[in-house]
């Protein structure tokens, strides 16, 4: 019973999150296919649908197996029915899925609380204006909605990416400004989050879109939430002193099959690579720019240096 309830609770939360996103998309005047916020919500919604469908499919497979199994001699149908209901495969949510439930709940709860906070703030401003004999515009006007306006995602249509040279992407970004499009690697797609006009956080989906396993879906959803939640966090960048915790090595023959997760280009023999304490390695120029200008965490595993 506990296993079945655990699975049902997880599915209920995911369905609630799906309904929440549908409501936001329908009630918003943004273009869900072209605007940054619309793309973000649509992408998150599609992965939730995949996750829910996968869970239901697993349960159905288990029920079909039990229902097609012949009852043992001497066992009446009533007893068999109880056995079928009790033995249908129902999975306990994994640690990653429980974390996903918490994040979905937080997003929905914060959205429900926000109108109340805004109404209280508006009433307070209104009362202050009446006392001062002034008319002030409510502070909530013009405030960007963090769900619909703060995140943009660049997704390739077929998961293959474009063919522009990856090494050009970092320099091109500095020249053309933070809102210009980014080079998309051949293994997945890149998330661009413009927190402030002069800065942005870049997160990479490192698994191909063609792989539909539940682990990949959960990973992609978690990255979407990482991008969203970063909007309320002040950036913590590394210092030149903290970079000393890492080491610089030369790429060897064995590294030629690996790639830098930032620029998505393969390592070349004798290139200088920075190896972080978590053992992930990147081109020195790529990762130094990330650590000193954007975040003090590894772009892959989010471990602080």
UniProtKB/Swiss-Prot annotation:
InterPro entries: E3_ubiquitin-ligase_domain, Znf_RING, Znf_RING/FYVE/PHD. GO terms for biological process: ubiquitin-dependent protein catabolic process. GO terms for molecular function: ubiquitin protein ligase activity; zinc ion binding. Residues 161-171 have a biased composition (Polar residues). Residues 95-116, 128-142 have a biased composition (Basic and acidic residues). Disulfide bonds: none annotated. Residues 53-185 are annotated as: Disordered. Keywords: Metal-binding, Zinc, Zinc-finger. A zinc finger (RING-type) spans 260-302. PROSITE patterns: ZF_RING_2 (PS50089). It comes from the Eukaryota. PANTHER family: GB|AAD18119.1-RELATED (PTHR22765:SF434), RING FINGER AND PROTEASE ASSOCIATED DOMAIN-CONTAINING (PTHR22765). This is Uncharacterized RING finger protein ECU07_0330. It comes from Encephalitozoon cuniculi (strain GB-M1) (Microsporidian parasite).
């Amino acid at each position: 019973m506990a296993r079945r309830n655990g699975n049902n609770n997880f599915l209920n939360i995911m369905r609630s999150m799906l309904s929440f996103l549908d409501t936001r998309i329908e009630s918003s005047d943004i273009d869900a296919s072209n605007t940054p916020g619309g793309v973000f919500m649509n992408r998150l919604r599609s992965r939730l649908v995949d996750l829910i469908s996968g869970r239901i499919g697993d349960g159905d497979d288990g029920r079909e197996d039990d229902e097609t199994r012949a009852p043992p001699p001497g066992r009446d149908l009533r007893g068999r029915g109880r056995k079928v209901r009790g033995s249908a495969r129902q999975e306990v949510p994994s640690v990653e899925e429980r974390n996903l439930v918490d994040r979905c709940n937080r997003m929905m709860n914060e959205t429900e609380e926000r109108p109340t906070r805004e109404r209280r703030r508006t009433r307070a401003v209104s009362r202050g204006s009446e006392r001062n004999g002034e008319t002030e515009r409510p502070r909530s006007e013009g405030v960007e909605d963090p769900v619909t306006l703060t995140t943009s995602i660049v997704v390739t249509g077929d998961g293959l990416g474009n063919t522009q040279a990856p090494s050009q992407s970092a320099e091109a970004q500095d020249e053309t400004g933070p809102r210009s499009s980014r080079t998309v690697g051949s293994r997945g797609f890149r998330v661009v989050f413009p927190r402030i006009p002069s800065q942005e956080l870049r997160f990479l989906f490192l698994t191909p879109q063609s792989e539909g396993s539940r682990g990949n879906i959960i990973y992609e959803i978690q990255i979407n939430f990482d991008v969203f939640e970063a909007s309320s966090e002040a950036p913590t960048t590394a210092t030149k002193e903290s970079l000393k915790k890492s080491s610089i090595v030369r790429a060897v023959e064995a590294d030629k099959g690996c790639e830098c997760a930032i620029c998505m280009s393969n390592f070349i023999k004798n290139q200088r690579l920075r190896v972080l304490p978590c053992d992930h390695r990147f081109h020195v120029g790529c990762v130094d720019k990330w650590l000193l200008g954007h975040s003090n965490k590894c772009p892959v595993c989010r471990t602080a240096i």
